[in-house]
Amino acid sequence: MQDLNVFKNSYLIIGGPNTKKSEVSRGLSKKLNYKLINLDREKYNYFNDFTDYDEEKYYKLIEIKGKLKALNYIHKYEMKHLNYVIDNINDNSVIDFGNTYLIIDDKNIINKLELFDNIVLLVSNNKYNDEFINKLNRNKLLNELSNIKVNIDNKNVVNIVDEIINYKKFKDIL
């Protein structure tokens, strides 16, 4: 078993739907010259029900398949890829974890997140995030683990990336 907080220099980017996770991950990895690891399921074409990722279709798909079945399907996928990352990671990485909204209640995944020292939680006041924020408030562990919280509303990616880096600098001083 690895020690907790193994990946001290890496950043794990989490957040609800429409929170610019991929853009922020790319921007942060570029600015820090870190390796980018993308776990977004749409990049893997995980759902073969449609070829191009589409938010509306995605949520409809979950409703059609039944929430429990769809979430179980997603958990297996995300655990597989998170385990892969944990087994193969080098330090100095930015990990785009994909849609955290769907795994927020999975204790197996949340416990794995304890390995990361820098967990960046992106939040927004968009309509998709209301339920995510409610779930997050109920999930004390994930709330405590996300030690870098950024509200992305009315900010461009450069501002968000700078805010993340400044959070980290401030945290290191304390």
Regions found by a protein language model. Give the residues of each.
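Hydrophobic anchor at the beta1->P-loop junction of P-loop NTPases
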Residues: I13
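P-loop (Walker A) phosphate-binding loop of NTP-binding proteins
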Residues: G16
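ATP-binding Walker
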Residues: T19
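Walker A/P-loop
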Residues: S22
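ATP-dependent small-molecule kinase phosphotransfer cores
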Residues: E42-I104
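Conserved phosphate-donor/acceptor-positioning beta-strand/loop module used by diverse small-molecule
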Residues: N111-E131
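Small-molecule kinase domains that catalyze NTP-dependent phosphoryl transfer to phosphate-bearing small molecules
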Residues: N129-E163, Y167-L174
